[in-house]
Amino acid sequence: MGRGRVELKRIENKINRQVTFSKRRNGLLKKAYELSVLCDAEVALIIFSSRGKLYEFGSAGTTKTLERYQRVCYTPQDNNMECETQSWYQEVSKLKAKYESLQRTQRHLLGEDLGPLSVKELQNLEKQLEGALAQARQRKTQMMIEQMEDLRRKERQLGDLNKQLKLKLEAEGQSLKAIQGSWNPSTATAGNSSFPVHPSQSNPMDCEPEPILQIGYHHYVPAEGPSVSKSMAGESNFIQGWVL
């Protein structure tokens, strides 16, 4: 009669757990030895009991197998880091060379360090300068045209604003004239005859003097000669006439 299937869970009985550990440990160590002998494999087995006791097996030595394991696991990562470092170094070298080339080209464009250049290189440099000059002139012309268009647009806006202000001023002038006409006496007399208005004199000095009534008073100023008697006679006649 065969044994039943063992349920995989922690054995609660301490004695049974220790017995099972001893049996399974010995069997595992035996299987590791058989695998190394039968298959010519390098096998390393490390076991720690629940009490911390170490059990190990190594066909070529546990330490040697662990060192080999570390080399296999960590060497590819080191190789990747080395490859990445090499790639960055090459990239930095390319950027440095490009930077130096740009600096050299800038000096040539400024007319510096032209001695080492050949005739062909000088011709290419001349073409580059001519092209750059043409582009600069074209850009300058374009900017001037844009500025002129902007000034024309502002001029049109100011002209329209001036026209609007002129029309507004004319309208206000017409309104002011209408108000002045409504308050003009001649216009008011012509418009409404039921309310006669006497025209005012523009200059008070132009008005004729009103007659002065003299009652019982005469300012006499004595004078010499015959004019005195004549004047007195005239004044006497004036008084007598008024009394009568």
UniProtKB/Swiss-Prot annotation:
GO cellular component assignments: nucleus
Any Pfam family hit: SRF-TF
Keywords: DNA-binding, Flowering, Nucleus, Transcription, Transcription regulation
Domain of life: Eukaryota
GO molecular function: DNA-binding transcription factor activity; protein dimerization activity; RNA polymerase II transcription regulatory region sequence-specific DNA binding
Biological process according to GO: flower development; positive regulation of transcription by RNA polymerase II
Domain K-box per the UniProt entry, residue ranges: 85-175
Annotated Polar residues bias: 181-204
Residue numbers spanned by region Disordered: 180-206
InterPro entries, per the entry: MADS-box/MEF2_TF, MEF2-like_N, TF_Kbox, TF_MADSbox, TF_MADSbox_sf
Function noted in UniProt: Probable transcription factor involved in flower development.
Name of the protein in its database record: Agamous-like MADS-box protein MADS3
Organism: Vitis vinifera (Grape)
Lineage: Eukaryota, Viridiplantae, Streptophyta, Embryophyta, Tracheophyta
